[in-house]
Design a protein with these regions (language model features):
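C-terminal-of-GTPase-core extension/linker across diverse P-loop GTPases
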Residues: 1-4, 10, 137-328, 333-339
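Conserved G1/Walker A P-loop phosphate-binding module
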Residues: 1-103, 113, 120-122, 131
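Flexible, active-site-adjacent loop/turn segments at secondary-structure boundaries
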Residues: 19-27, 41-47, 53-54, 66-67, ...
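Short, surface-exposed linear patches
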Residues: 32, 56-59, 82-86, 93, ...
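Solvent-exposed, flexible loop/coil residues
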Residues: 25-33, 40-42, 47-53, 59, ...
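Generic signal for short, ordered secondary-structure residues
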Residues: 8, 25, 61, 110, ...
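Phosphate/Mg2+-binding loops and adjacent switch elements
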Residues: 73-190, 200
């Protein structure tokens, strides 16, 4: 929805004024794209152990897209332009306003539930348009396409009943058969409530949804780490909402980090969850995958307790893993490759 704090939150993420923030609808027209560091305290600890010259965190890309209004599926507001932009992202981060402020322009009353339903309905309507065209296409009517047609028909019924595709598609097989339809409601979704700084939900453990005060996060992003910590303490907030958001987005994308550390740098490397050791080595350098021999691995906690590779090895905490090893988040690794 327009004027709910998306661009304020986006700018806080990037710690600079990149997206236009204005008190009128559709201040954002073209998408703003920013690459954000993934908070990872483990890198600071590893850097101290290894006396690293630098720290290189993992990153995730955020896109600030124009607000959607009722009727977007048929062209209202920025309509099809918005929907084209959202089709290009992997996870939808939906921001809804849940605070009162008479100075901020907003159509209707403050009702996050209704705002969420408006957005979800428009995405469902657009997907219905896609599915209707698919049902009429020769591809799903062709011989041998019975499974694909069954999934499309299932989607048509589910979407008509108001269910998003992510709920309708229950199995991995269904999701794979529907992949080339590029459905908007098949994407994973994170719901963020933009609340006031006095809202008690900011001070409670976060559940499935996130409660963030974009105004506070904007202020925190302009402060030094020490001043930001003091301000959060004053507000009674234990953890930055942005840190929670970034980590949740990273996990929702199905990503994890393995870690490398040495005098030159301590670094988090981004891989897909479930990736095997040779493919992970290939993220560092393509030749490493081809010439992979084995991976020297230590659990992060054990590595820190041992204060480095030598003692970890002496204590028997270092493992040598082969080509079938599935990487885990927080693995501290050195890859052994052939010449």
């Amino acid at each position: 929805m327009p004027n709910v704090g998306k661009s304020t939150l986006f700018n806080a993420l990037l710690k600079r004024q990149q997206a236009l923030v204005a008190n009128y609808p559709f201040a954002t027209i073209e998408p703003n794209v920013g690459v954000v560091e993934v908070p990872d305290e483990r890198l600071n600890v590893l850097s101290e152990i290894s006396h690293s010259g630098r720290i290189v965190p993992a990153t995730v890309e955020f896109v600030d897209i124009a607000g959607l209004v009722a009727g977007a599926a048929t062209g209202a507001g920025l309509g099809n332009k918005f929907l084209t932009h959202i089709r290009e992202v992997d996870v939808i981060l939906q921001v809804v306003r849940d605070f009162a402020d008479s100075e901020i322009v907003k159509e209707g009353s403050v009702d996050p539930k209704t705002d969420y339903e408006v957005i979800e309905t428009e995405l469902i309507l657009k997907d219905l348009e896609t599915i209707t065209k698919s049902l009429e296409s020769k591809d799903v009517k062709a011989k041998g396409m019975e499974k694909k047609r069954a999934v499309v028909e299932k989607l048509f019924a589910g979407l008509n009943a108001g269910k998003p595709a992510r709920i309708v598609l229950e199995s991995d097989e269904d999701r794979e058969l529907a992949r080339d339809l590029f459905l908007l409601t098949a994407k994973k979704e994170i719901l963020v409530y933009n609340v006031s700084e006095t809202d008690q939900r900011l001070r409670e453990p976060m559940g499935e949804n996130l409660y963030i005060c974009a105004k506070v996060e904007s202020e925190l992003s302009s402060l030094s780490a020490e001043d930001a910590k003091a301000y959060m303490l004053e507000l009674g907030i234990k953890e930055s909402g942005l840190d929670l958001l970034i980590n949740k987005a990273y996990a929702s994308l199905g990503l994890i980090s393995f870690l490398t550390t040495g005098e030159m740098e301590s670094r988090a490397w981004t891989i897909n969850r479930g990736m095997k050791a040779p493919q992970a080595a290939g993220v560092i350098h393509t030749d490493f995958e081809k010439k992979f021999i084995k991976a020297k691995v230590c659990d992060y906690g054990k590595f820190v307790e041992a204060k480095g590779w030598k003692e970890a090895s002496d204590k028997g905490w270092v493992r040598f893993e082969g080509k079938e090893y599935e990487m885990k988040d927080g693995d501290v690794v050195e890859f052994m490759v052939g010449s």
